[in-house]
């Protein structure tokens, strides 16, 4: 990772590179827990966020990560920028480059846009989510959270539940989990499971209760209403009955402990109920905190930081 200029996806990272990011995220999290959440590591650097899709968590997380490292930040509001006047993506990138931006986090509705930008700029590019392709920093924060809570990833049984077909979060998690030695099962309606996904090395299960009995960790994906409108689901109520993580389904496990993750935002009453979302086993808010730490680690490494993680 130290030698990489960009973070475009977990598919291209080695196990060692992933572990380097997770290791450096630990001291970054310590910084976040302090009263004074600031170190001078990236003073003089400029980090921009360019999001062509709505985002609260990811965008704010990148901006806070940069500020905690003392970088200057620039947030491009696409809805009120020159993009609305017809400015091309390349011209937008060249403008930011000319302004002195060194690192840019990009989210786009089309897969491959961060890669395209990386081939046409001197800036370091971070993929903040591209189409159905990847969302690497979300997967990294999920991995970090699992390791923080269970002290390991190798040998764990991790289930990803929900709309696998449209989920960049699922894809990045699959790459990362498999590289770190976890077993992975995907579970959801057959209409939302990609054909031949088993070729990646994952198991496919359509019965949620069997999946919960198998798993040590479950990552519950958000279900979007537009999937129902497009015919992938009959009703959200039916989805909740079959695949929603509920108190009733957990009680059938007879006290078995499950670590429960969710990338947010939660659709309470659809993919997860209030009882589960607010239970001690759910670590959604810790994921948010860890997301800032992981993104600090990524910014630090892309800016040329060493693997010791010594930032003070």
Swiss-Prot record:
Uppermost EC category: transferase
GO CC terms of this entry: cytosol
Transferase recorded as keyword: yes
Pfam families with a match to the protein in the record: OTCace (PF00185), OTCace_N (PF02729)
Keywords: Pyrimidine biosynthesis, Transferase
Signal peptide range: none
GO BP: any one term: amino acid metabolic process
Catalytic activity: carbamoyl phosphate + L-aspartate = N-carbamoyl-L-aspartate + phosphate + H(+)
Disulfide bonds: none
MF-aspect GO terms: amino acid binding; aspartate carbamoyltransferase activity
Residues the entry annotates as binding L-aspartate: 85, 168, 222
Pathway terms, separated by semicolons: Pyrimidine metabolism; UMP biosynthesis via de novo pathway; (S)-dihydroorotate from bicarbonate: step 2/3
Domain of life: Bacteria
Catalytic activity, EC: 2.1.3.2
Assembly and binders: Heterododecamer (2C3:3R2) of six catalytic PyrB chains organized as two trimers (C3), and six regulatory PyrI chains organized as three dimers (R2).
PANTHER family the record matches: ASPARTATE CARBAMOYLTRANSFERASE, ORNITHINE CARBAMOYLTRANSFERASE, MITOCHONDRIAL
Function: Catalyzes the condensation of carbamoyl phosphate and aspartate to form carbamoyl aspartate and inorganic phosphate, the committed step in the de novo pyrimidine nucleotide biosynthesis pathway.
HAMAP family with a match to the protein in the record: Asp_carb_tr (MF_00001)
UniProt record similarity statement: Belongs to the aspartate/ornithine carbamoyltransferase superfamily. ATCase family.
Descriptive protein name: Aspartate carbamoyltransferase catalytic subunit
Organism, scientific name: Carboxydothermus hydrogenoformans (strain ATCC BAA-161 / DSM 6008 / Z-2901)
Lineage: Bacteria, Bacillati, Bacillota, Clostridia, Thermoanaerobacterales
């Amino acid at each position: 990772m130290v030698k990489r200029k960009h973070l475009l996806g977990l598919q291209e990272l080695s196990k060692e590179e992933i572990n380097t990011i997770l290791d450096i995220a630990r001291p970054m999290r310590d910084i976040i827990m302090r009263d004074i959440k600031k170190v001078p590591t990236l003073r003089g650097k400029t980090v921009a966020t360019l999001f062509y899709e709505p985002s609260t968590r990811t965008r704010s997380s990148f901006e806070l990560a940069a500020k905690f490292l003392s970088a200057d930040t620039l947030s491009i509001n696409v809805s009120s920028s020159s993009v609305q006047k017809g400015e091309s993506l390349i011209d937008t990138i060249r403008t930011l480059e000319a302004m002195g931006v060194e690192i840019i986090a990009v989210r786009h509705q089309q897969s491959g846009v961060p890669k395209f930008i990386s081939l046409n700029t001197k800036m370091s590019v971070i993929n903040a989510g591209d189409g159905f392709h990847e969302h690497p920093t979300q997967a990294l924060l999920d991995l970090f959270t699992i390791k923080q809570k269970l002290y390991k990833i190798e040998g764990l049984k991790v289930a990803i539940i929900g709309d696998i077909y449209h989920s960049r979060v699922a894809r990045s998690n699959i790459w990362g989990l498999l590289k770190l030695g976890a077993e992975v099962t995907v579970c959801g309606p057959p209409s939302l499971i990609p054909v031949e996904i088993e070729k990646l090395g994952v198991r496919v299960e359509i019965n949620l209760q069997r999946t919960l009995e198998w798993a040590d960790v479950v990552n519950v994906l958000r279900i979007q209403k537009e999937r129902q409108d497009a015919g992938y689901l009959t009703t959200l109520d039916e989805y909740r009955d079959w695949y929603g993580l509920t108190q009733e389904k957990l009680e059938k496990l007879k006290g078995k402990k499950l670590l429960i993750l969710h990338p947010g935002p939660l659709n309470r009453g659809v993919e997860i109920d209030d009882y589960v979302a607010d239970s001690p086993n759910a670590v959604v808010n810790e994921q948010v905190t860890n997301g800032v730490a992981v993104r600090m680690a990524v910014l630090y490494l892309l800016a040329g930081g060493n693997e010791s993680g010594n930032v003070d």
